[in-house]
From Swiss-Prot:
Homotetramer. It is found in: Cytoplasm. The gene is ndk. This is Nucleoside diphosphate kinase. Belongs to the NDK family. Keywords: ATP-binding, Cytoplasm, Kinase, Magnesium, Metal-binding, Nucleotide metabolism, Nucleotide-binding, Phosphoprotein, Transferase. ATP binds at K9, F57, R85, T91, R102, N112. The lineage of its organism: Bacteria, Bacillati, Cyanobacteriota, Cyanophyceae, Oscillatoriophycideae. Pfam families: NDK. Its cofactor is Mg(2+). The active site is at H115 (pros-phosphohistidine intermediate). SUPFAM superfamilies: Nucleoside diphosphate kinase, NDK. SMART domains: NDK (SM00562). HAMAP family: NDP_kinase (MF_00451). Pathway: Purine metabolism.
Length: 149
């Protein structure tokens, strides 16, 4: 099964949307294997968003992510990365489809509520950056037989 990293950003935490995010991933049939509330250090934020280091918004993005705790999660399931991207919606909430997290709750690209890994390599590196192996639970949900052939 594939794993992906998902983070509810400060705006999602402040707006009380963590439960809605978790509910959508659980309803899709994904298994939660890692979950924690994190007060993000500047170093961690800069590592996570390192790909944007040369972009003009990098500084404000780092300040935003360290401003309030975030909820970091690892979800597991068949096609988890691509499915998570669909559940999350387009980066710009104004372009996100209704029924997606950003489409239903987002109003501004700078406050787009949630981050999700964009591919297998990114997922692996983000999971390793945010979680130690001992923080990830290996378990089998009772619903597995009802989800997969």
């Amino acid at each position: 099964m594939e794993r992906t990293f998902v983070m509810v950003k400060p705006d999602g935490v402040q707006r009380g949307l963590v439960g809605d995010v978790i509910r959508r991933f659980e309803a899709k049939g994904f298994k939660l294997v890692g979950l924690k509330l994190v007060s993000v250090s500047r170093e961690l934020a800069e590592q996570h968003y390192g790909v944007h280091r040369e972009r003009p918004f990098f500084g404000s993005l780092v300040e935003f992510i360290i401003s309030v705790p975030v909820v970091a999660m690892v979800w597991e399931g068949k096609g988890a990365i691509a499915a998570a991207r669909k559940i999350i919606g387009a980066t710009n909430p104004l372009e996100a489809e209704p029924g997606t997290i950003r489409g239903d709750f987002g109003v501004d690209i700078g406050r787009n509520l949630i981050h999700g890994s964009d591919g297998p390599d990114t997922a692996a590196s983000e999971i390793a950056l945010w979680f130690s192996e001992s923080e990830l639970a290996n378990w089998e949900p009772a619903t597995k037989a009802w989800l997969y052939e």
